[in-house]
Regions:
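A Zn2+-metalloprotease active-site environment signal
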Residues: 2-282
Length: 282
């Protein structure tokens, strides 16, 4: 009897796939898992944040206005008296709108006027909402301004600002566990309330704003002017009117069409209310 070693196949324990391909597949799998976990945490964190009583949110925030420092300096030579008059006017109009919007008990919008040139408005934590001079001076009527304020009050009523913070904090916690540094992400939380919300939240705020404007003025004329103005501002900057799929806000054309449809139900001679306090162009 004789013994001999059989030839060993060279392909044993050798993958036919390159090491680079295996590495890329592993990275892709990890990225998908992180993305799914982030999405779940964002939704869950936002849902849980909405359960925080508004009184608790208000007491924790106090007089701080999150996101105000992100708007830029604006005109440093602005007239303080003019600023105070406009802010008081915004507060008066916000209070009138809040009275017809069935706000939760204890929720009262607090309006602020920012000396920033960029046309913008947003709601933030604690019932605060901000309107910039760049937006205010472009408003052709009080009706248009009321739509802006009512839209932001609609976000406050739905607790969208605290939901955005809750979702962002949950994702930041995940990133901190993975990267070991969550402190660098904390300053970004305030920015979340200025970046917009989901398209569903925006449509809900649009509906609330239209209902409030109609309740206050008896018609929705002038509402469509808001989105025309925003579209004109973005046009020269090259931002255009992108598809709603790639934007947190519904496309301006779609929003203008909805506002025009609502305004069409009003009498042709329904008057627009002029702004009660004019703004210098600066």
């Amino acid at each position: 009897m004789s013994y001999e070693n059989p030839p060993v196949p060279h392909e044993v324990n050798v993958s036919r796939e390159s090491t680079l391909a295996q590495f890329l597949r592993l990275c892709a799998g990890i990225a998908v898992c992180i993305a799914l976990a982030s999405a779940v945490l964002w939704v869950a964190g936002g849902w849980l944040a909405r359960l925080v009583p508004y009184s608790t949110e208000r007491s924790m925030v106090g007089a701080r206005v999150f996101g105000l420092d992100l708007l830029g300096e604006g005109d440093a030579d602005g007239d303080p008296a003019d600023h105070a008059r406009i802010e008081a006017y915004l507060q008066s109009l916000a209070s009138r709108l809040g009275a017809v919007m069935d706000l939760p008990e204890g929720m009262a919008p607090i309006a602020h006027f920012a000396e920033a040139d960029l046309p913008n408005a947003f709601a933030t934590l604690g019932g605060h909402l901000i309107v910039t001079r760049g937006l205010y001076r472009r408003m052709p009527s009080e009706n248009a301004l009321a739509l802006v304020l009512a839209h932001e009050i609609g976000h406050l009523r739905a607790r969208d600002p605290i939901s955005a913070i809750g979702g962002g904090a949950s994702v930041a916690l995940l990133m901190a566990l993975l990267a070991g540094d969550g402190h660098a992400l904390l300053p970004q939380f305030a920015r979340l309330v200025t970046l917009g919300y989901s398209r569903q939240a925006e449509r809900r705020a649009d509906d609330a704003a239209l209902a409030a404007v109609i309740a206050l003025y008896g018609h929705a004329r002038g509402s469509e002017a808001v989105f025309r103005i925003l579209a004109e501002h973005r046009g020269p900057a090259g931002l255009g009117d992108g598809p709603t799929l790639f934007s947190t806000h519904p496309a301006d054309a779609a929003r203008i069409a909805r506002m025009e449809a609502a305004a069409a139900t009003a009498d042709a001679d329904a008057a627009l209310t002029p702004l009660q306090v004019a703004a210098d162009a600066h």
